[in-house]
Amino acid sequence: MKLLIIIASILVLVFLLGWIGLQIRPRPFSPYPEQTGEIKTIPLAAGLPAPVERFYKTVYGEEIPVIDSAVMKGHAFIAPFGVKLPARFLFVHEAGKGYRHYFEATWFGMTIMKVNERYVDGKSLFEPPVGDPIIDDASTNQAANLAVWAEAAWFPSIWITDPRVRWEPVDDNTALLFVPFEDKMENFVMRFNPETGLLDSMEAMRYRDAGPQAKKILWITRNVEGKKIEGSKLNAIGSATWMDQGLPWATFTLEEVHYNVNVSEYIRQKGP
């Protein structure tokens, strides 16, 4: 009996230690050395669907910034294996064209998992923590292209400054956003908050897995009310959910952002 109590106590302590380690946020990445570049503006275009026009007037007013690139850093919780892990992230975007991601998941602030991925020149690269890299896979390319446009929720002017993009009305609080992918267009269902006018969520059919047998799953990204991007009305917190899982697999909190910086080389690198 005494031995069982000792074993149970050890198991409880191990579990508690593991849980405590997952509550500690990692230190942020070093600040990006280049400051936001010159940002030009264009007038808000006429003829947008009503909720879209309301959104842009709420966020920007009548003058819309032209964003060509973005470097974004922050903290996250990710659950790639069903266990919520604290993490830090780096997103580098060439607006409307490509990106790279770097994640570090941590335990007691120590890195236990690294992930590099990018989508540049229409080709994806995903380096999982375990296994071989996935390179220029058709399903992964489609998923990555949707991420290009979904992550633009942190610089949404690209959805009207890029001439390839178009909007279609649905109702007072919903519109369809059509974005280019290879030789065709794909679309998001964009849902806006009727009270604030801000974007609540984006929905699209997206591949989660690689390979020819992969199937599209409803993918939902949500803006989370609370912290705002400094100097703006845009939410700094966002989540991503696969419909068949029901709960977010990732929640990101943006803490540093620089727009219109030179990312021509940085977007092709790996690591922080």
Report residues per predicted region.
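Gly/Pro-enriched, hydrophobic low-complexity segments
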Residues: L176-S264
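N-terminal mature ectodomain segment of secretory-pathway/periplasmic proteins
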Residues: R54-D132
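Short, hydrophobic/aromatic-rich segments at coil-to-beta transitions
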Residues: V66-K73, A95-Y102, V170-F178, D200-S201, ...
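Short, solvent-exposed aromatic-acidic interface loops
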Residues: A105-T111, E127-I134, A204-D209, S239-G246
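Short, exposed beta-strand/loop patches in secreted or surface proteins that constitute
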Residues: F89-A95, E117, P163-V170, M190-R191, ...
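Hydrophobic membrane-insertion alpha-helices, especially the h-region
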Residues: I5-Q23
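Flexible, processing/modification-adjacent segments and terminal tails
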Residues: F126-E182, Q213, K270
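N-terminal leader/targeting segments and the immediate start of mature chains
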Residues: R25-V71
